[in-house]
Structure formats: structure tokens, C-alpha cells
């Protein structure tokens, strides 16, 4: 016996599509040396628009996880466990494949010796897997307490372990070096410091858990008006708390600080409420087609964009298009942005064909 599937919210697809389009945009400039400031990540402490796209997607993944597990009444069974483990492993392995491809195409051999173990897809996999397992084994009313305790413990680790300085003594870097080894980590300015490392995945899981709990609030509401009221309330409280606490705990994406989790979850909740009001209540949907095409096939198009980006870079095609065409016409910075926008349009043309044909690639 399964529960009724909740009515699909178009706003959720659109927010998912906006974040995926944003991830593709910021990951594929024509030149990393010519990127406008809002499209760059904060150097360390701080928050830019670019810093929002990944945590927004993790928040949305939490809501999607709620919808998915609701069909099974959130009950533990071998079938549900197999589904969770299978999806977790598949997403994680796709991330490993992307890292191996990126390393191998430039060294011209299968480079396992310097294979980066973690990354965006791996973080998504762990966030989904842990949240799903907790959701089918623990009462959902305990989610806020689990999130708060996790973030509090992580803050203590950062505070006592030089966690708010970008240095080799940072506890996040030290733990990851110990657990993964420097040859299997991302290197930031020559230093082994992985922004999707193992220790910082602990608070990142909280992003998915907050999204999951917001999914519970969403689909237990009696109508769309109550949905946006709940989301705006949660969003306002979290955003205010995040910025207030940032005076003692800096907002920092690289270490995924507790205030980064709280603030970005608050902003994501508020933005989703705004989209529900615009799209699902007011019915202003004419502009949605572009982002919906991304939103219904999110992981597929993200993986496609990563693979194509690697191949374009390895063959020199991206450099040729940027330097010989776009820079000549537009200049360095506008040309770099134009390349990223054209790449987003290229990816959209692929995923829009799938959308029009009703093809949804599930990972």
C-alpha cells in the first residue's frame, strides 16, 4: 500500500531548472581569468550569487526525496533500502567517472593515481543516501533536532580546528588529507583543500535534510496559500538567523559552515515560496518553458554538460571559440560570459528535445 503521490508543483521544477542552468553557467566560462565577480565563488568567507546554486540544488533534492519516499509511506523495507542504495551508488560512481575522465583526457591515460574521490555528484549521492536512510528509520519530528546537533558539533570542530582560515592547519583540510590523501583531493592554489571534501559533507547532508523537512511542510499544507506561508516563515527565520550568526560563524562555502547551510536554506525556501506564488497561484507560466526543460532532467543534463565541457577543453575547441571568435568580437570579459551563455543554450537545446518528446532520464 502506497500513499497518494502529491500534486506536482511546477515551481519546484522551475527552481530546479534555474539552479541547474546556473550551475552550467558558472562552471563553463570562456576563460577562468575573465569572469565577472557575481559569477565567481567567494574567495573564502562570504557569499556570492554563484555560491547559491549548488546548495539550492541540494535543498531541492531534499524536497524531491520526500516526494519519492512518500510513495512508500517512509517505511523501511528491503525493496526501499535497495532503491536508496542503488541510486546512491549510481550517482556516486557517475561522479567518479567524471573525475576520472577529466584527469585522463589531459594525461592521455587512465589516471587512477591522482583520481579525485569526491566532487559535486558524490556530495549529492551522500546527501541523498544519508537523508533517505534517516527518513525511513527515524520519526520526522526529530529532523530539526538532528540538523541542529549536527551543525552545532560541526561548528565546534571548525572553531577549535582553525576552520575559518584557508590554511594547511584547517581541520577540514587536515581531516581530508588524512582520510583521502593529497593526491585524491582538489587542490586550491597549490594546497590540498577539497570544497566537496569528506568532513564538510557532514553539514552538506543537512541541506538535504532541511529540504526534506520543508517537503513535509509543503505537502501537509491544505493549499498553495498555506504552502507559501510556511515556506516564507521558514525562509525568513533561517535567513535572518544565518546572517545574525555569521558574526561569530562566518558564511563560508569552502568549509560549508553552519551559517552557510542556514542562510542558503533560508534563501532557497523563500525563493521557492515566491515561485509558487508567481507560477502556481498567479499562473504566470509563459516564461517557464526554458527552465522546466532543465528541471525535469536535471542530473542528466548536468552530467552531459560536464562531459561535453571536458571534451571541448581537451580538444581545444573551447579555447578556439572563445579566443578566435568571441574575444575578437566582444572582448575578454563579455566574450567569456557569452561563451557560458551559449553553452547553456546548447545544453538547453539538447534537454528541450527530450522534454518535448516526454523523455525523462532518471538517475
Located regions from the model:
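Alpha-helical transmembrane segments and their immediate juxtamembrane cytosolic regions
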Residues: 1-363
Amino acid at each position: 500500500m502506497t500513499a497518494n503521490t502529491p500534486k506536482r508543483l511546477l515551481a519546484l521544477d522551475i527552481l530546479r531548472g534555474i539552479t541547474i542552468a546556473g550551475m552550467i553557467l558558472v562552471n563553463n566560462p570562456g576563460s577562468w581569468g575573465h569572469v565577472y565577480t557575481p559569477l565567481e565563488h567567494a574567495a573564502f568567507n562570504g557569499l556570492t550569487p554563484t555560491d547559491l546554486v549548488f546548495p539550492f540544488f541540494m535543498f531541492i533534492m531534499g524536497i524531491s526525496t520526500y516526494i519519492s519516499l512518500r510513495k512508500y509511506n517512509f517505511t523501511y523495507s528491503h525493496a526501499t533500502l535497495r532503491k536508496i542504495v542503488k541510486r546512491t551508488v549510481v550517482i556516486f560512481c557517475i561522479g567518479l567517472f567524471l573525475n576520472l575522465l577529466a584527469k585522463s583526457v589531459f594525461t592521455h591515460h587512465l589516471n587512477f593515481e591522482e583520481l579525485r574521490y569526491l566532487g559535486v555528484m558524490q556530495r549529492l549521492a551522500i546527501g541523498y543516501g544519508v537523508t533517505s536512510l534517516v527518513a525511513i528509520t527515524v520519526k520526522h519530528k526529530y529532523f530539526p533536532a538532528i540538523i541542529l546537533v549536527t551543525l552545532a558539533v560541526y561548528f565546534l570542530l571548525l572553531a577549535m580546528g582553525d576552520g575559518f582560515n584557508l590554511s594547511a592547519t584547517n581541520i577540514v583540510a587536515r581531516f581530508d588529507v588524512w582520510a583521502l590523501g593529497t593526491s585524491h583531493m582538489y587542490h586550491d592554489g597549490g594546497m590540498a583543500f577539497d570544497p566537496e571534501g569528506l568532513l564538510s559533507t557532514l553539514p552538506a547532508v543537512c541541506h538535504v535534510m532541511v529540504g526534506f523537512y520543508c517537503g513535509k511542510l509543503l505537502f501537509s499544507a491544505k493549499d498553495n496559500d498555506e504552502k507559501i506561508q510556511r515556506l516564507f516563515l521558514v525562509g525568513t527565520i533561517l535567513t535572518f538567523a544565518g546572517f545574525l550568526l555569521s558574526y561569530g560563524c562566518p558564511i563560508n562555502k569552502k568549509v560549508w559552515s553552519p551559517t552557510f547551510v542556514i542562510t542558503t536554506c533560508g534563501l532557497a525556501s523563500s525563493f521557492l515560496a515566491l515561485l509558487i506564488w508567481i507560477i502556481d497561484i498567479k499562473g504566470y507560466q509563459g516564461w517557464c518553458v526554458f527552465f522546466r526543460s532543465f528541471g525535469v532532467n536535471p542530473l542528466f543534463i548536468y552530467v552531459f554538460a560536464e562531459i561535453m565541457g571536458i571534451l571541448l577543453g581537451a580538444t581545444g575547441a573551447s579555447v578556439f571559440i572563445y579566443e578566435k571568435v568571441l574575444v575578437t568580437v566582444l572582448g575578454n570579459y563579455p566574450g567569456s560570459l557569452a561563451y557560458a551563455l551559449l553553452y547553456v543554450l546548447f545544453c538547453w537545446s539538447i534537454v528541450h528535445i527530450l522534454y518535448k518528446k516526454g523523455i525523462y532520464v532518471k538517475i
